[in-house]
Amino acid sequence: DPTLARKPVRSAEELRKEEAFEARIDDGDFIEAKDWMPEHYRKTLVRQISQHAHSEIVGMLPEGNWVTRAPTLKRKAILLAKVQDEGGHGLYLYAAAETLGVSRDELLDALHSGRAKYSSIFNYPTLNWADVGVIGWLVDGAAIMNQVPLCRCSYGPYARAMVRVCKEESFHQRQGFDALNVMMTQGTPAQRDMVQDA
């Protein structure tokens, strides 16, 4: 029945609110949690922020496995700080999503049931220390490229969370580069091959 597929007609009041909302975004204003927003905007934000939060939490796992096996005490301390940062990023983002009226339990239920996703890069195993370095240098480097524009997104709580996340991701990228650089410049031929393989 084609009538079932039709969207409901919006009232003049809803159209006026949506025009004012779009004008605020066009002017570069932040939309805050208590501001009126169209339902499709809210749903899109919940989906995007939750996927991002899930990726930060799941992203702790491949590197967390290496905390006890890092090659030096210095590397262990750096990796532990990085894993803690990633957990914090997930928490900042869950808090930003909660400002949209969704609970953390709902977000996690969606992840556990498969209705919500996370970045598939974290499904690849970290078989050796070079894999950990590549995650820091290249995966976190790619994340920075994707996430810096989010510091200027229209939703204020998300944008503010991203400012801190991006600063910390820069540290993560530097530690990944440094770990690989040490392996390439001071490592054995087997370690250099390991970096190339990673």
Regions found by a protein language model. Name each.
Residues 2-19, 82-110, 176-183:
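Conserved alpha-helical segments that form or flank metal/cofactor-binding pockets of metalloenzymes
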Residues 56-125:
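N-terminal hydrophobic targeting segments
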Residues 41-52, 71-89, 132, 157-169:
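Alpha-helical scaffold segments that form or flank carboxylate-/histidine-based iron centers
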Residues 29-50, 110-136, 153, 186-191:
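Acidic/His metal-coordination segments adjacent to aromatic residues that form catalytic metal sites
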Residues 36-41, 59-81, 143-158:
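Helix-loop segments that flank and shape redox-cofactor active sites
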Residues 157-198:
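A contiguous pocket-lining binding segment that forms or flanks enzyme active sites
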Residues 55-63, 89, 139-146, 172-176:
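Amphipathic, well-ordered alpha-helical segments in soluble domains
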Residues 1-37, 75:
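Extreme N-terminal leader/anchor segments
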